[in-house]
Amino acid sequence: MRTPKPVVLTILDGWGLNEDTSSNAPVLANTPTMDRLFATCPNATLTTFGPNVGLPTGQMGNSEVGHTNIGAGRIVAMDLGQIDLAIEDGSFFRNAAMLDFAATVKAAGGVAHLMCVVSDGGVHGHILHGQAAVKLMVSHGLKVVVHAITDGRDVAPQSAEDFVAALVASLPQGASIGTVIGRYYAMDRDNRWERVEKAYDAMVLGKGEHARDAVSAVAQSYANKVTDEFILPTVIDGYEGFKAGDGLFCLNFRADRAREILLAIGADDFDGFAREKPVLSALLGMVEYSTRHSDFMTTAYPKRDIVNTLGAWVAKQGLTQFRLAETEKYPHVTFFLNGGKEEPEVGEDRFMPKSPKVATYDLQPEMSAAEVTEKFVEVIGKGYDLIVTNYANPDMVGHTGDLQAAIKACEAVDRGLGAVVAALEKVGGAMLVIADHGNCETMVDPVTGGPHTAHTTNPVPVILFGGPEGAKVHDGILADVAPTLLQLMNVPLPPEMTGKSLIDL
């Protein structure tokens, strides 16, 4: 088999397949390149949710899970399932790091602050984890304050009232809610420090909007026509901020959107905005957020090493690779694709155009796709063996719930893909086009009729362009992508990769 060069993986983040075309942005968009690829290239579908990507049954996938499985070439048991099981079997309540945190805060005479996503979306956090952690801390004689991060992005846009009410009803004596904060502020990942500062002020200083109780905080937000994701950081009556000796436990099990607020709270060298660092007795994370965070935090569930990822294995063969995505998805094609390893592999180059500085991406659905494409076309001619690129638009604009904007997002990506195909035709390269999960193919909630902003469990495409003559592709899972790329590169699989190539010759 001829070895094409480069071999390319293009990830259309959030571009799923849905037979219902009524709110299906990829179908409603003008996408001549994707239409051509579907019509002329071998294609099939991939499953991106549940046990096929290491998640509980029925749990939708997400970009972290997707890129981790893609890079690993095997099904990777994800943190959500691990933590759920620990709560179920009771080992959660015996977790050494959590017990150390509780003992340290108690010895300092402090309060245990718990930062928790209050939804059952299961992408960054889960309300059940928060309820379990409250139970654990109260059982050790600690006063507990919950900082409720409202979602509205991985669940319905106006579901926080029910989730917050359920959390309040479950709180034992000694536990209360101190703040209610939309994830737009508490979980930024694009260095928009003006947002993070508002969340910091509410949590740490007790400054912000005010409400008499947590449910009222959500209700008054709705009265102002502000949905869950965007709830202004709101301080509940009686909460006065962090005090010396207090401790913070962040329950996010996905790293990217927890990093900024935690740097503001815990890093000595933080310079995102002027602040006086709180004097905490303990700072605990559900998982490891980065090596920098590990300098000032402990971890309840340390990461497990994923040996011989796609990037590591390509590097071991003495081959070169390039990773490309705008800011919003850059960690996914680097950190997550490399199995949680931040440093590039030998022979791995990277480029990250900045995502546009807009409040929400429906205001600029093209995002930075043009810059991504310009660099993409350039590096196709540079002699790399493997190129991995992520187009963020379908997912990031899909999360806004704006169908017309999502259509524009798909069209912007399709234009870029057209230039990429032309560049590959010139050099004789091959490409797999896939998505890591669905999103923008369902922009209206079929139950409520309102905007649908979450990921889906729909199948996603896999298309082979420039592959071997007569090749076909079959349905599979994300763990099969790396073995497929390695087959195209004529590189043997490492023994750890249990995925199977999607190509039938």
UniProtKB/Swiss-Prot annotation:
Report the active site residues: 63
**Pfam families the UniProt entry points to:** iPGM_N, Metalloenzyme
Reactions accelerated catalytically: (2R)-2-phosphoglycerate = (2R)-3-phosphoglycerate
The answer to keyword Manganese applying to this record is: yes
Q: Which GO terms describe its molecular function?
A: manganese ion binding; phosphoglycerate mutase activity
Q: Which GO terms describe its biological process?
A: glucose catabolic process; glycolytic process
> What is the E.C. number?
5.4.2.12
* Assembly and interaction partners: Monomer.
Cite the NCBIfam families for this sequence. Answer: pgm_bpd_ind (TIGR01307)
Q: Which family does it belong to?
A: Belongs to the BPG-independent phosphoglycerate mutase family.
Q: What is this protein called?
A: 2,3-bisphosphoglycerate-independent phosphoglycerate mutase
Q: Which species is the source of this protein?
A: Agrobacterium fabrum (strain C58 / ATCC 33970) (Agrobacterium tumefaciens (strain C58))
The opening ranks of the lineage are: Bacteria, Pseudomonadati, Pseudomonadota, Alphaproteobacteria, Hyphomicrobiales
